[in-house]
A protein has these predicted regions:
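Rossmann-like dinucleotide/phosphate-binding beta-alpha-beta segment
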Residues: 121-172
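Short, charged, surface-exposed secondary-structure boundary motifs
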Residues: 26-28, 65-69, 88-92, 165-168
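Phosphate-binding beta-alpha-beta segment of Rossmann-like dinucleotide-binding domains, i.e.
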Residues: 76, 81-130, 156-159
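An N-terminal-biased, well-structured beta-alpha scaffold segment characteristic
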Residues: 1-77
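Short gly/ser/thr-rich secondary-structure transition/capping motifs
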Residues: 13-20, 36-39, 110-119, 166-172
């Protein structure tokens, strides 16, 4: 709701509707900017000869489901959310890695069972270890940056094997 009000404030000359609003055929045809992809309205607008659609801003990084030829033919701008989740995904990956190498799952289970088995968890030191990241795009680069902070030696895999910033070496 707050974001919707912010959009309305910066675009007072536009009518802002959400996917939960009922749109008449005329309102649908008048859409100029679409935030996110509506699986029913979007294809109708692309197929229409009278649609005013000019820009689609996806909220995801992936756009492989879009009809690029139709977008190009109609002159519709397409942008995506590439990289917007790179920090949160990288933090999650490192959190899971740390939980695994420090035996946190076993420790939590023992705590819930009110037991303490000093020999059960096997702790592994991450510092100095090698990490291979499949994909050297924005998420992979952010993960590499965080991993270097833990003194990991970071290698990558990408489509061409080109060296990417933050990686010691990359493979294809």
């Amino acid at each position: 709701e707050e974001q919707l009000e912010q959009v309305k404030a910066v675009a007072p000359n536009y009518l802002v509707k959400t996917s939960t609003d009922h749109l008449s055929s005329a309102e649908e045809e008048a859409i100029e900017i679409m935030l996110g992809w509506h699986k029913e309205i979007g294809p109708r607008l692309l197929a229409s000869d009278t649609s005013h659609l000019k820009w689609i801003q996806l909220i995801s990084a992936g756009a492989d489901y879009m009809d690029f030829d139709k977008l190009r033919e109609k002159g519709i701008l397409l942008s995506n959310g590439s990289g917007i989740h790179s920090v949160s995904i990288s933090e999650h990956v490192l959190g899971v890695l740390l939980a695994h190498t420090r035996g946190l799952q076993e420790s939590i289970q023992q705590q819930m069972q009110h037991t303490w088995n000093q020999t059960a968890p096997s702790y592994q030191q991450l510092s100095g270890q090698k990490m291979l990241i499949v994909g050297t795009g924005q998420i992979g680069q952010q993960l590499a940056k965080f991993a270097k902070g833990l003194n990991l030696q970071v290698y990558g895999v990408n489509t061409s094997g080109h060296v990417t910033e933050g990686f010691i070496e990359c493979y294809s």
